[in-house]
Amino acid sequence: MIDTNLLRVTVCDEGELEKSTTHFIGSRKIEPEQWITWASECKYLPESDAVALCATLIDRLSLEANVVPVSSPVTICGDIHGQFYDLLELFKTGGTVPNTKYVFMGDYVDRGHYSLETVTLLFCLLLKYPNQITLLRGNHESRRISNVYGFYDECQNKYGHGNVHKWFCKVFDVLPIGALIDESVLCVHGGLSPDIRTIDSLMLLDRAQEVPNKGPLCDIMWSDPDDDVEDWVISQRGAGFVFGAKVTEEFLMNNDLSLLCRSHQLVDEGFKYMFNEKLATVWSAPNYCYRCGNAAAVFEIDGNNRSTKYFNAVPDGSREKPDRVVAPYFL
């Protein structure tokens, strides 16, 4: 059973942000309405605003539990990977914030052309509507990965230095690592860990750090399910494990859960059930890396009702293409 005393509700009342569009951190104005307007137009914030945004979220998220409780109805989303215009298409498909409640399962940055604008928009929405959007940490929300696969270079190119990247990574450190929907569905980015048998154990991890190369925090970000595996196998990714139906069913039974929901792996159709519908993979980056040709999906939960909505990539003519090279990489 889950110790519900370990679950901390969101500490910031979004009503306080609704009362006024301007707030302060130190001497810096916090202007969520203006920031959302800019970010929705694929514009990144001035450096001082970006730092203020990050500092505010760090203070708030540091008080959150590792696994945050979420009530349905809610829409679950997978990897985005800097595909800003496809994120807008996702909102057209699933509904806008705050009209639709969302859980995003990580990997907002790297690979796509607009990692900075993508994560900025999501962070601004989180600031304005903390009870309507939950952002989990993925394996790309780390210094080690984002330094290499696009996000650091993008911040460097757009701001002229790496300071903003450092601030975003500080926010990444305190993003929750799981969401528990209706005390029945657990959402994480990657998968399970042989060192974590219960949600209570997951709650006790020290998440406020760089994602390590091994251990349970690493496993939650990096592990994958496999139909051909029964127990635990070391992953060929170089981090995490591959796990099977037996492991999944035992974890669900031990924690009185009905479903494990995750992302982390490209699914051509955008959504895939495994293990007799005990595990679901959601993928929300259509035409991944602008070449894979895959569809994308969002997964809707409303009590015992579950449904999937699919969407495709925005046509090339509807998106701008920056002059920048994406490093060859496929995780």
From Swiss-Prot:
InterPro entries documented for this protein: Calcineurin-like_PHP_ApaH, Metallo-depent_PP-like, PPA2-like, Ser/Thr-sp_prot-phosphatase
GO molecular function terms attached to this record: metal ion binding; protein serine/threonine phosphatase activity
Keyword Coiled coil: no
Bound cofactor: record note: Binds 2 manganese ions per subunit.
First-level EC class: hydrolase
Active site: residue positions: H140
Chain sites annotated for binding Mn(2+) 2: D107, N139, H189, H264
Record's catalysed reaction(s): O-phospho-L-seryl-[protein] + H2O = L-seryl-[protein] + phosphate; O-phospho-L-threonyl-[protein] + H2O = L-threonyl-[protein] + phosphate
Disruption phenotype: RNAi-mediated knockdown causes lethality in 17 percent of animals. In the 1-cell embryo, cortical contractions are severely reduced and the pseudocleavage furrow is absent. Positioning of the spindle is abnormal due to reduced pulling forces that prevent oscillatory movements of the posterior spindle pole during anaphase. In 15 percent of animals, causes defects in chromosome segregation resulting in daughter cells with multiple nuclei.
Record-linked Pfam families: Metallophos (PF00149)
Binding site for Mn(2+) 1: D79, H81, D107
Chief localisation class: cytoplasm
This protein's record includes keyword Nucleotidyltransferase: no
Family matches, as SUPFAM superfamilies: Metallo-dependent phosphatases
Domain of life: Eukaryota
Keywords: Cell cycle, Cytoplasm, Cytoskeleton, Hydrolase, Manganese, Metal-binding, Protein phosphatase
Enzyme Commission (EC) number: 3.1.3.16
One Gene Ontology CC term in the entry: spindle pole
Gene Ontology biological-process entries: actomyosin contractile ring contraction; cortical actin cytoskeleton organization; establishment of mitotic spindle localization; first cell cycle pseudocleavage; G1/S transition of mitotic cell cycle; positive regulation of mitotic cell cycle; spindle localization
Cofactor entry: Mn(2+)
Localization terms from the record: Cytoplasm; Cytoplasm, Cell cortex; Cytoplasm, Cytoskeleton; Cytoplasm, Cytoskeleton, Spindle pole
Signal peptide: none
Family the entry assigns: Belongs to the PPP phosphatase family. PP-6 (PP-V) subfamily.
Quaternary state and interactors: Forms a complex composed of catalytic subunit pph-6 and regulatory subunit saps-1; the interaction increases pph-6 and saps-1 protein stability.
Name of the molecule in the record: Serine/threonine-protein phosphatase 6 catalytic subunit
Source organism per UniProt: Caenorhabditis elegans
